[in-house]
Curated annotation (Swiss-Prot):
This is Chaperonin GroEL. It comes from Streptococcus pneumoniae (strain P1031). Disulfide bonds: none annotated. ATP binds at T29, L30, G31, P32, D86, G87, T88, T89, T90, G413, N476, A477, A478, D492. The keyword Phosphoprotein does not apply. Its main location: cytoplasm. SUPFAM superfamilies: GroEL apical domain-like, GroEL equatorial domain-like, GroEL-intermediate domain like.
């Protein structure tokens, strides 16, 4: 395929047009009075959303050069979403502002490399000032405030703060669709995995069809148990202790399963068998997690261990285990807290180094199960369109809340970015680096201007007053009042503001220093074949 190439100002101008088209579409959603954008879907009803990254991903422009500019801004939104989970619209607005001011100066003859150095220095100073202004998020009320601001719903804020209180900041909080109209929270404490009992005759409550084991021993193995003789010595030892047993194995079949069921029915001892969770290497890792959580050992050939040689010392223990037909929950495992903490640290490091989104998701699930539990927010709505929009808002709120707990909070509504202007303005730079610094100074005002504009106010008047206000005092665009943003619960996580600014500056600098753009030349549309005269028959 032949290529089309544009150079210097032509190349940059085409990309900037794409940046503006995407940013102008996304920025109308910013702030409490932000509007929605309707996205056409190939199948089903249109999606109505105010989620910046969702909108950015949908935009595809016909002109290849403009499309590259749009895609670079979309990358800013995606990267910010990956790191902080929110702030995608702010990142888009900042990118457009830096590119717009930068292009003016490059066109006027400024050195793009000098501008880039100035931008990088200014952003580093702004980030440092943001961190210095941060307030730690320590209590349930503060968490609820962050979630409520992001989701625009106090009820959602309460659900998320309650979920984080129950399962901890590393716990898994999943968002599912409810069968009803109401949104509700469901919390499963302890480690849960998706494997149920192998026989319904193992239940202890025939009405609820669940097996409850109090203070059980837990046999953990990646082997298949077919011959009861393999575990007979172990069963005899457990029988003397008069405690129930949970067997987690690759499978239990052959004569072993009916023998266990028969002894359960006769009341000889209480036993429940389940299949090991996961597959392949992930199964081995999950079994090791369970062993560390319960203080047991995985009986596996990898360690040279055989079932017939297993003793009670190799078994895990827990305060309670509940098993139904689909899942198993282990509560209060008896594992060594230091060993659990070390395992958590290992999984965290794997999350940071993995490049696979699927692997990262599975590692986060394992981390949460070791850390304390799983919370499920079941989203209810009247229509499918409303349900999709609500799920996106709750996902944003959850991500923003995690970010707030991690790095603290600052005043919201774009106020925090405006508050760091003095720290950037005092930087002593020379040459075109000064121009780069001034570009960042102007960009830091842009989120406040856009939020005010979307709410029907004049942005320049708001920013002028904000520059002279005390730290933390800002403009509440929802009411049109000047308030203490922190006291009013109008807050942003530092991680969100920081990531938005850093990612915006990074991509904007790349666009400013671009000197040539190579794109695929559009394929000419082939003319329709001429009609065969013989096919025209009596038409002549």
């Amino acid at each position: 395929m032949s290529k089309e190439i544009k150079f210097s100002s032509d190349a940059r101008s085409a990309m900037v047009r794409g940046v503006d088209i995407l940013a102008d579409t996304v920025k109308v959603t910013l702030g409490p009075k932000g509007r929605n954008v309707v996205l056409e879907k190939s199948f089903g009803s249109p999606l109505i959303t105010n989620d910046g990254v969702t909108i950015a991903k949908e935009i595809e422009l016909e002109d290849h050069f403009e499309n590259m500019g749009a895609k670079l801004v979309s990358e800013v939104a995606s990267k910010t979403n990956d790191i902080a989970g929110d702030g995608t619209t702010t990142a888009t607005v900042l990118t457009q502002a830096i590119v717009r001011e930068g292009i003016k100066n490059v066109t006027a003859g400024a050195n793009p490399i000098g501008i880039r150095r100035g931008i990088e220095t200014a952003v580093a100073a702004a980030v440092e000032a943001l961190k210095n202004n941060a307030i730690p998020v320590a209590n349930k009320e503060a968490i609820a405030q962050v979630a409520a601001v992001s989701s625009r719903s106090e009820k959602v804020g309460e659900y998320i703060s309650e979920a984080m209180e129950k399962v901890g900041k590393d716990g898994v909080i999943t968002i599912e669709e409810s069968r009803g109209m109401e949104t509700e929270l469901e919390v499963v404490e302890g480690m849960q995995f998706d494997r149920g009992y192998l026989s319904q005759y193992m239940v202890t409550d025939s009405e609820k069809m669940v097996a409850d084991l109090e203070n059980p021993y837990i046999l953990i193995t990646d082997k298949k148990i077919s011959n009861i003789q393999e575990i007979l010595p172990l069963l005899e030892s457990i029988l003397q202790s008069n405690r129930p047993l949970l067997i987690i194995a690759d499978d239990v079949d052959g004569e072993a399963l009916p023998t266990l069921v028969l002894n359960k029915i006769r009341g000889t001892f209480n036993v429940v068998a389940v299949k090991a969770p996961g597959f392949g290497d992930r199964r081995k890792a999950m079994l090791e997690d369970i062993a560390i959580l319960t203080g047991g050992t995985v009986i596996t050939e990898d360690l040279g261990l055989e079932l017939k040689d297993a003793t009670i010392e190799a078994l895990g223990q827990a305060a309670r285990v509940t098993v139904d037909k689909d899942s198993t929950v282990i509560v209060e495992g008896a594992g060594n807290p230091e060993a659990i903490s070390h395992r958590v640290a290992v999984i965290k490091s794997q999350i940071e180094t993995t490049t696979s989104e699927f692997d990262r998701e599975k590692l986060q699930e394992r981390l949460a199960k070791l850390s304390g539990g799983v919370a499920v927010i079941k989203v209810g709505a009247a229509t499918e369109t409303e349900l999709k929009e609500m799920k996106l808002r709750i996902e944003d709120a959850l991500n923003a809340t995690r970010a707030a707990v991690e790095e603290g909070i600052v005043a919201g509504g774009g106020t925090a970015l405006a508050n760091v202007i003095p720290a950037v303005a005092t930087l002593e730079l020379t040459g075109d680096e000064v121009t780069g610094r001034n570009i960042v100074l102007r960009a830091l005002e842009e989120p406040v201007r856009q939020i005010a504009h979307n709410a029907g106010f004049e942005g320049s008047i708001v920013i002028d007053r904000l520059k002279n206000a005390e730290l933390g005092i800002g403009f509440n665009a929802a009411t049109g009042e000047w308030v203490n943003m922190i006291d009013q619960g109008i807050i942003d996580p530092v991680k969100v503001s920081r990531s938005a600014l850093q990612n915006a500056a990074s991509v904007a600098s790349l666009i400013l220093t671009t000197e040539a753009v190579v794109a695929n030349k559009p394929e000419p549309v082939a003319p329709a074949p001429a009609m065969d005269p013989s096919m025209m028959g009596g038409m002549m």
